[in-house]
Amino acid sequence: MKRIRLINLILIMFCCCNMLAQNITVTGQVVDVTSEPIIGASVVVKGTTNGTITDFDGNFTLSVQKGETLHISYIGYVAQDVKVMGNQPVKVVMAEDTETLDEVVVVGTSMKKSDLTGAVASVSSKVLEEKPVTNVNQALQGRVAGVFISQPTRPTDDASIKIRGINTINGSTDPIYVIDGMVMDNSFSGFNAVNLNDVASIEVLKDASATALYGSRGSNGVVVITTKKGKKGEGKVSYDGWIGFQTYANTPKTMNTRQLFELRKEAYTNGYMQTNPDGDVNAYVNDVIMGSNTAFADYEFDAYDNNKNYDWLDAVSRTGVQHNHVVSLSNGNDKGSYYISFGYTDNKGVIEKSEQEKYTGRINADQQIKSWLKVGTNTTFTRTENTLVDDGVMNRARCANPMLEISDEIETLNWQGIFDQNNFNPLRSLKVDNDLVYNRLLSSNYININPIEGLNLRSTFSIDYAQKQQNKYTPNDIYESERYGTQGEAKDDRDTRTVWQWDNSLSYEVSFGKHKLNAMVGTSATRTTYNYINATATGFGTNLFGYHSLGSGYKKDQRGLSTAWSEQTLLSYIARVNYNYAGKYLLTATARYDGSSKFAKGNQWGIFPSVSAAWNITEEKFMKNQTIFDQLKLRAGFGIVGNQNIDDFAYLSLYNVSYTGTSDTGYTNSFVSNGRRGTPDISWEKQKQWNLGVDMAFLQNRVRLSVDAFLIKNKDLLMSHSLPTTTGFSSTIENIGAIENKGLEFALNANLVRAKDFEWNFAATLSMDKNKVTRLYGDNDVVYNVDSDRNIQKEGNLFLGESRNTIYIWKTGGIAQEIDMDRLNKINWNGYNVNPGDLYPLDYDNNGQIDQNDRVVIGSTDPKFYGGFSTDFSWKGLSLNAVFSYSYGAKKLSPWYETLIGSTGSGVASTDLLDRWTPENTDAEFPRVLAGFDYNHYGASSMDFSVQKASFLRLSALTLAYTFPTKVINALKLANLRVYATGSNLFCLTNYNGYDLETGDWYPPTRMYTFGLNLAF
């Protein structure tokens, strides 16, 4: 027995020694095909949890046993297995995984770019992060062909986006957004709720083939957002933060006190001489203008004599400060991953009190429960707190009299000493509290079952809960309360919207020989409920409680209460087939059958099919020996897309419940029409879309060019039109009219220089689209947009054969000169006067009189082409990136500039009027000025004289960044460290004379200087 024990002991010791002998430390380096180190690659002993990740030089060290196999993986590269034969260093060269790198996420499914047959543009998170903005739309500007983005008009607003121009008349042109499979629109500040740092990639779906799976909701295009996930390897903690300082980018130049004083004096003098041609002008100037308060108040004389200038806009302005901070944590393994982020943004605008604070939180997690079962969630919550300032604050400040001393004691801003009860003092208006809060919860939760190879069953339940609350309080001690007789007013508006979406799909993928087939069927159900309540109270004895105590308003007869509710549903059945033969011939066929509650029974359902094909010519044998193209792919597609973008219950005539009576006589309910007549037979608006495209790559894929041409014909437009008063209704919605839209798109990406330490990349987009109205209701060839006095407006009119966005106005005949008067006196000006120095409209139809028939379409607000370009230089750790956007050929009205050039000195005036007509300056650009007398003449705003050219080239962002070298980062025990400085909206080359041709005249455009930090460990 002892002998046996001894033998066993010897064997155990031998085995232990042998095991110890096999336990070795292996070192190695992981690089790419250019010998650049791959940072953060996962190195794991196959079949175990023993592993590590590579450092900043691509190196790793791991204790293993001889004969074990290392599994090396990194996202975007082909994984490799390396068997350990000894303790000699291991060098692993990883090749790019083109299958993964070329994938885009479309409709919750990953597809290789080379397999796409539709028009899809992809933008990575790296590109999005090149501009320090908090809105994804702003980050996309100039990056995607066919996508036109306008900057937000206020810091609390979203940037607007259009994909492939105008495809409808009355309806919205906004696309839908799909965030991790959840379909949403931009209401309730939706897109502004997305944290840009959480975005992994964005795909923009532009044609019917690409948007087909979204049916009617994708008629204006689809923006698909995929958020970040955790990655395999060691956990990662990162921080991204920046702070920016904002100033006015552009303020149109206005006259100072002396210039404005002389302008008004000249206007009064011209008015006097026009009505008193034989009068004593010197006596009038000395005795009336300068010797009385006919033209000037005493405080205006004082400002003129002492050369005082008061800048009211500056008094309500400040240097804006915006800062953004995001912390994220992520990790993953073979069984699951998670990504968690927290964000905070504070944007103090350039107008006093204007501010937006935003809080975001996100958790993305997935877990492989079984080899055939995976579950996951993508959930985010956003709270946005806006402190709003009434538009009138800036407008009244910029319109204020520069001869009026700045004070918060005066109630209204006056010109010539004349009391203006509606021109409230903007400094006092800043006392109004106006708070707007959005809360939004987005949660997409899925279960994925793979019972057999190739078969995939996925069920996703998503919820989008949005809450909006706006509270406003107007104090009882400012003139607004006195003017409107409220003695203080409090308002409480609350909106809630709940959307749930349930998607189920069954897909099967099979390959046999050179054939690859992917088929999918599915259903989608969506229900949206909306609730609104408003309460108003007036009469407050104290301002202490603001809008927090509506019940204390003592004016009981001025209390208000209103509510609204609506519900809509959409049920869809979906089928899609993708076919691929040898990577050469690709075919995609899709059909979606949508049923909407917005239409009456019998018209609720619509079927929307699409088909597209592609030919990878470079995969053909006859192309193997050519050296020009690395890729040459032709694409063609056709599809029908629906649109249901109308109000709920438009097929019914709706009535509001009201009441009549008094507390003495009693109250009775009555039903009052809302003015719109229902149309029971309205149905889907339908678009037919055609797309042709070609994708090319040259010089070892370093230059890529995509070109697309499209045609969209939209008929049975859901249009609202007016009705005769004899019908008892004011309007109705019908399937009437048609519009056509066509265009070209170009997208270029080039790696111009690629050396060891230096790289230069360039990207550009160019888009052209043109729409025209091809049919209106009835036999009409024009539908005018008229105001309450039946005056035809300059914009909003519809003409057959013209764009939806025309400008309809008189053409300018010029400034009348003495030599023209014989000819001009023969024209009937319909109550207006034309004399030397006056502007006059052109008699377009040459009938000797000026009327509405002389107005013409002089252009549209649509650009002839638009796009953007960027250039990126990098040398070692230093990089310089510039992003430009441009637009050409659009025309635009600027109400602000029209006000400035229409001034007679009794209002703020443009310095352009320094070059005005006088008998000594007959070649002036601007007409003479007249005031103080009854003289009816044409103003600049009534003619195309005031229409602006809206072409521009804007430097959207210029960024200088430095990424610290590996030695420094390792010494600090970090994974990444980058600092940068960015200038946004540094310049804009344009002939536009308003504030900004993108943001408009309502809020001044800003320029921002930003300093940022990115670090990870």
Residue ranges: model-predicted function:
Residues 60-63, 138, 175, 180-208:
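Short acidic/polar hinge/loop motifs at secondary-structure boundaries
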Residues 596, 834, 887-979:
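Extracytoplasmic gating/loop element in the C-terminal half of outer-membrane beta-barrel translocons
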Residues 238-303, 534-536, 734, 751-860, ...:
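Conserved small-residue
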